[in-house]
Amino acid sequence: MMQPKKTKFRKAHKGRIHGVASSGATLAFGQFGLKAMEPERVTARQIEAARRALTRHMKRAGRVWIRIFPDVPVSKKPAEVRMGSGKGAPELWVARVKPGRVMFEIDGVNQQIAREALTLAAAKLPIKTRFVARIAE
């Protein structure tokens, strides 16, 4: 599971995801990618599930780049605990994803396999996505 080795603070505010992605909105490494179409918090488990779906469908051929990283801690209080008495303990890590952000990139496979693999990966994510391809140069 992905998570930061060290953070400045143990807990973070919930926050909101405003605007569209300015950085990370275009393909940087691979020929094909999966782009987010709506704002959402994506957990480390969801990223890992999508990565596994990608690599299994590609049968270890090609290369995968994960362009998002879960760096925001989400805290949770234990079950059946009354409100108050402070914020809960960090439970999981999430990545705040803005619309337009390229989340995954792949290379080394043909377009049909890339589209199938990224569709399988998209099914593991709580977000509407779009398949993007680099324009033939």
Swiss-Prot record:
PROSITE patterns: RIBOSOMAL_L16_1 (PS00586), RIBOSOMAL_L16_2 (PS00701). Coiled coil: none annotated. Gene3D superfamilies: Ribosomal protein L10e/L16 (3.90.1170.10). One of its GO terms (molecular function) is tRNA binding. Pfam families: Ribosomal_L16. One of its GO terms (cellular component) is cytosolic large ribosomal subunit. InterPro entries: Ribosomal_uL16, Ribosomal_uL16_bact-type, Ribosomal_uL16_CS, Ribosomal_uL16_dom, Ribosomal_uL16_sf. Keywords: Ribonucleoprotein, Ribosomal protein, RNA-binding, rRNA-binding, tRNA-binding. GO terms for biological process: translation. Binds 23S rRNA and is also seen to make contacts with the A and possibly P site tRNAs. Part of the 50S ribosomal subunit. Belongs to the universal ribosomal protein uL16 family. This is Large ribosomal subunit protein uL16.
